[in-house]
Amino acid sequence: MHCAILKAEAVDGARLMQIFWHDGAESLYPAVWLRDNCQCSDCYLHSAKARKLLLEALDVNIRMDDLTFDQKKVYITWPNGHYSEFEANWLKKRCFSQEARAGLQGELFLPECQYWGSELQLPTLNFEDVLNDDDHAYKWLSSLKKVGIVRLTGAADKRGEIIKLGKRIGFLYLTFYGHTWQVQDKIDANNVAYTTGKLSFHTDYPALHHPPGVQLLHCIKQTVTGGDSEIVDGFNVCQKLKEKNPQAFSILSSTFVDFTDIGVDYCDFSVQSKHKIIELDDKGQVVRINFNNATRDTVFDVPIERVQPFYAALKEFVDLMNSKEYKYTFKMNPGDVITFDNWRLLHGRRSYEAGTEISRHLEGAYADWDVVMSRLRILRQRVMNGN
């Protein structure tokens, strides 16, 4: 972005700065915001990209004492003699117009979301390419954010491969099941995933108040028959539910449900949480699905008259997930790693037969969306700059 200032002036009793740009656009900036964001070394620590100015020292009713400009910068003197400079590009990027704010938020959070159903073309990349090449790593994480799932092929059929992916993004998310965990049938299993039975559509770990955002599953050994993976785009299904039955959508997005998980693994644990099955942001957009029927508690903290309507709404939601139109079925092969958005996708597994030895083995891990998005922003900057 290369912006040129045509004119800058103080308005509204010097409480606002107005800029006229060479491209014909206009921008307004509050004086209090400008003073708060002074970029001088007394007010801003450039080595940490962090504000030093204390809010206690900020006059919220401040006015500009003097304002000058050239094409590239604005120069402001404040009533106490403090002096600030602001670059044109920096100001234009932070314009308060609705269009500019939406554009910057899009750059920061990359909200583009591609909904899908049974027609999904599963994004696929090579495991080693993702580890060793920034362009491929960027494609991996940008597709993960946009589509919600990416398959990586070519990993070794041994434990430890997803630890490499964790290091590629930064670090993995430790839970009560460990840094990584083994999905295989176990005697006296402490999780339904560690059985050979069918797993219905679910998100992992809603028993935590902050469920892991991304899940990584590496296929080390696969059964010959059964064990197919099933996934569904929860955000897409939520949209259809809202269209088909707004009342059911309203119930699931307003009713807090208790989840529990008690046992021993990495250490002993007794976890409780409360979530709405469909979690919305302040604009009414779905931001997370919290649903695991296995760990949904017997405790249900609602008035009795709301119990049956809740079950009816939840059943309709689950029936939609299981319709052929929305679910996608595939089988992992040894060396495959699937990485997916645990806040958006629900996943399941078809049953398989137990043998005298372990016939199916996946290694799993979690990552936090903050860590993934951090790496995605860094990779995006590198790729866009050609570094």
Curated annotation (Swiss-Prot):
UniProt keyword annotation of Transport present: no
Gene Ontology CC annotations of this record: cytosol; mitochondrion
Modified residues (Phosphoserine): S351
Compartments, record wording: Cytoplasm
CDD domains in the record: CAS_like
Annotated Fe cation binding sites: H202, D204, H347
CC cofactor note: Binds 1 Fe(2+) ion per subunit.
Any matching Pfam family: GBBH-like_N
Tissue-by-tissue expression: Expressed in the liver and in some extend in the testis and the epididymis.
UniProt pathway annotation: Amine and polyamine biosynthesis; carnitine biosynthesis
EC number: 1.14.11.1
Keywords, sorted A to Z: Carnitine biosynthesis, Cytoplasm, Dioxygenase, Iron, Metal-binding, Oxidoreductase, Phosphoprotein, Zinc
Residues annotated for Zn(2+) binding in this entry: C38, C40, C43, H82
Physiological role: Catalyzes the formation of L-carnitine from gamma-butyrobetaine.
Classification via NCBIfam families: carnitine_bodg
The name this protein goes by in its record: Gamma-butyrobetaine dioxygenase
Organism: Rattus norvegicus
Organism lineage string: Eukaryota, Metazoa, Chordata, Craniata, Vertebrata
